[in-house]
Regions:
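Segments adjacent to and within acyl-thioester-processing domains across lipid
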Residues: 1-4, 127-137
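Intrinsic-disorder/low-complexity, polar/charged segments enriched in Ser/Thr/Lys/Arg/Asp/Glu/Gln
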Residues: 14, 25-29, 98-100, 112-114, ...
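Beta-strand elements of well-folded, non-transmembrane domains
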Residues: 34-36, 107, 121, 133-135
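Hydrophobic beta-strand-centered segment that forms part of the acyl-chain substrate-binding groove
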Residues: 64-102, 126-130
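Catalytic strand-loop segment that frames the active site of acyl-thioester-processing enzymes
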Residues: 11-51
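Hydrophobic beta-sheet segments that form the core/acyl-binding groove
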Residues: 19, 86-122
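Compact, glycine-rich, soluble single-domain proteins
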Residues: 43-66, 81
Length: 137
């Protein structure tokens, strides 16, 4: 399954490189290979390049959207990022690192869903957050 088959974002806002696993309406796992050519690194100095934290949250949001839009009844709907609770950033991400984002949906009622997401890099946790999604009816 291709990322572009499920989420409407395109370059430069499509941040997921590959969908690793998906259980429709339950969970999704995706990968992102962080390269030096990413748009968010262009204004940073060569020695201090780290991925900005809102981009990490957007990776989690896009992974959660994959879990939602893989459900036949929601395929093709618009999903909006409704909010963040309890985001906990553990470490920085630098160019050359491979991220694995995992989001598990915890509640889904009508057009509102919540989930818990975690991004890891080489086995260490980078960020975890509770997310809210709102689907357009």
């Amino acid at each position: 399954m291709e990322v572009t088959d499920l989420i409407p974002q395109r370059f430069p806002l499509q941040l997921l490189d590959r969908i690793v696993a998906v259980q429709p309406g339950v969970s999704a796992t995706a990968e992102k290979l962080v390269t030096i050519n990413e748009w968010f690194f262009q204004s940073q100095t060569l020695t201090g390049r780290t991925m900005i934290r809102p981009v990490l949250l957007e990776i989690l949001a896009q992974t959660g959207v994959v879990a939602l839009l893989s459900m036949p009844e929601h395929h093709g709907n618009n999903v909006f990022f409704g909010g963040i609770r309890q985001a906990d950033f553990k470490t920085d991400v630098r160019p050359g690192e491979r991220l694995e984002a995992m989001v598990t949906l915890t509640k889904l009622r009508r057009q509102i869903g919540t989930g818990h997401g975690v991004i890891t890099c080489a086995g260490r946790e980078v960020v975890s957050a509770d997310l809210t999604f709102v689907m357009q009816a």
